[in-house]
Amino acid sequence: MNNSIPERFIFQCALFKNLEREVFMTHGYVDSHIIDQALRLRLKDETSVILSDLYLQILQYIEMHKTTLTDIIINDRESVLS
């Protein structure tokens, strides 16, 4: 993988936030399984090598940190609601 996001910024990057927002608009909620599916669909259809690398990196990171992702999503929702 030639292109990457620093690991500490993966869940804060615009690419992930846009994906999360689109999943929420489509399904009404976000969890690690739906994010995983959405990433796999994007990765399958992506023609840009750069975006493919970034989607793959995010997907791998989510697979390693599923509980962390759930906590981040919950905390993000709470901060938006307050």
UniProtKB/Swiss-Prot annotation:
One of the GO BP terms on file? single-species biofilm formation
Q: What induces it?
A: Strongly induced at 16 degrees. Expression is repressed by YcgE. At 16 degrees Celsius with blue light irradiation, expression of this operon is absolutely dependent on YcgF for relief of YcgE repression. Part of the ycgZ-ymgA-ariR-ymgC operon.
The name under which this protein is listed is: Uncharacterized protein YmgC
Originating species: Escherichia coli (strain K12)
Q: What is the lineage of its organism?
A: Bacteria, Pseudomonadati, Pseudomonadota, Gammaproteobacteria, Enterobacterales
In the UniProt record, the gene name given for this protein reads: ymgC
